[in-house]
Amino acid sequence: MHNFYNYSPALGKTYVYENKYYKNLGTVIKQAKRQKHLEQHEIEERSLDHLDRYLVAEDPFYGPGKNQKLTLFKEIRNVKPDTMKLVVNWSGKEFLRETWTRFMEDSFPIVNDQEVMDIYLTINVRPTRPNRCYKFVAQHALRCDEGYVPHEVIRIVEPSTVENNEYRISLAKRGGGCPIRNLHSAYTTSFEHFLNSVIWDNFYKPIVYVGTTSAEEEEILLEVSLVFKIKEFAPDAPLFQGPAY
């Protein structure tokens, strides 16, 4: 006779698993990858231990060398909202012979051997009216095709914010440095040759646009300068001078 009250003990068993013996599969894979990454990172660090003897400036502008500033021009510009105005295009006002001659005479003495390590284009921007609440923005191109005529005004598209009212660009080409040591002699020989064959053969000639985040037309003061990073060598002079030597 079939018993309706038959009960299998196996149907009522409950199994309790302790979580400390089980891990999520994703966690196991992530930990394995993390451990492998740490091991590779330690190997890479050990391969660079010999570089700990050297010091490198976080910002090359403040690194070794002497900074010589050449102010090209100061101007006041009106900038309309949502637009940026061309401020540097090397059309001629950047190359006033009197300004360059005074700079060369003061910065590059004849008796010293000096080498240009880098050139920075710095643009200092300030509002002419007080209590104006907006930020300065800028864009630049290091190089362009020969014969390219840049537009005077462009729309603002993904600009860079100007920090501390100063926009600074390194103009050094790949490899950097200027191969000519006696810059004073190269300049006095020919002004045009110095610019074309010494400066622009080794450094970029950029175009720069500046604008504001203001919704109104703003009047801004621009100061455009070139900062030469100079490596200076001791002059060839005897250690002792005088009648006893």
UniProtKB/Swiss-Prot annotation:
**Species name:** Lymantria dispar multicapsid nuclear polyhedrosis virus (LdMNPV)
Protein name per its UniProtKB record: Polyhedrin
InterPro entries for the chain = Polyhedrin (IPR001746)
Report the family membership.
Belongs to the polyhedrin family.
Molecular function via GO:
structural molecule activity
Q: Which GO terms describe its cellular component?
A: viral occlusion body
Tell me, what does this protein do in biology?
Major component of the virus occlusion bodies, which are large proteinaceous structures (polyhedra), that protect the virus from the outside environment for extended periods until they are ingested by insect larvae.
Q: Recite the UniProt keywords alphabetically.
A: Viral occlusion body
